[in-house]
Amino acid sequence: MKKILLTSFLLSLSIVVLRGQNSEHYAFRNSHILKPFLSEIRSTANKVEIASLNKLDDNYYVNDYAGRPFMEVHLGAELPLYYLLNRQKKFKFSVSTYIANILLIDMFEENTAPVINTDYFFGLKAAAVKYVDNPYIRNLGLKLVPVFHESTHIGDEFSIHGYDELPGFRRVNVSYEAWEIAAVINDPDTIKSNLLSAKVGFHGLWNNSKGYYTTDSLETKNQTAPASKKNYEYYIQMNLQRTQGFLCSDRLMNVISVEANNRLKFSYDEAVEESRSWNINLYVGWKYISEKSGHNVGLFFRYYAGIIPNGQFRNTGGYRYAGLSLVYH
């Protein structure tokens, strides 16, 4: 699969060279193409969410959390490097970097309001979009991420309590480098009209033998955790945007975005086999389109079901998350 990724990356670069004649070239200019859908689990959109959870890791140091709301904060940015535009051939190509951070916070816990999990990721992305003359298919796109890094850490209160009080507690460091490839039909780009978009993608690890996580004997009380084996994930995403029709307008866009991803459910015990899990991430709501600033503000309902998506807790299934999300991007 790595050879396929490398071949695809080289092919995309060769296409850019061939299309380079009569093209416009820009440095550090936003291309707007192949941005993450709102429901993408590793989205770079800025979000503040207040939500209800049905469960957490069994080692969490308090057990009354189900009766209060939690906060999840997403901070992210995409930094453009290069943008090619060929108006005659209706073709766009861009290279950018991105970085984001996700915090899960027990904000209304009375003692310390602890950060439960910190997740950050960054990578390099190449994207290409070709517009076609079809009333239903506006464009076709390809996204290649030759490398991205993700790392997650549980909060100090969580880990200190677990290490001091729980005999079987282990702190697992989820940290890995991966690659990703995705194809899209009807990338939203700068389109503001009604549009149904679809994306499929796949990612794998560069170091398959290391897996998604490592352990330190000082943090696991000399217990071992087997390395992960099924080190890949894939997803399908659908994104519907409407500015014409019921309960929407040119300035108030209705968005329904959903991702179904198949991810590895971790196992830190030799006796328990790791397994795979289908997970759903759904956003439904509206965003206000600002023509002057180029940024949009939206209010959405979010629902997630599957394994806990946060780092070390990906060994826990049956997770439900429902709440309101204030989005700025």
Residue ranges and their predicted role:
Residues 4-14:
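Sec-dependent N-terminal signal peptides
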Residues 18-20:
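Boundary at the C-terminal end of the N-terminal hydrophobic targeting segment
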Residues 22, 29, 37-38, 82-95, ...:
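Short loop/turn motifs that connect adjacent beta-strands in outer-membrane beta-barrel proteins
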Residues 22-130:
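Transmembrane beta-barrel domains of Gram-negative outer membranes and organellar outer membranes
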Residues 48-54, 95-101, 142-148, 198-206, ...:
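Transmembrane beta-barrel strands of outer-membrane/channel proteins
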Residues 70-78, 123-125, 178-182, 233-239, ...:
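Membrane-embedded beta-strand positions in outer-membrane beta-barrel channels/transporters
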Residues 91-242, 303:
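Outer-membrane pore/translocation modules
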Residues 208-329:
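Outer membrane beta-barrel transmembrane domains
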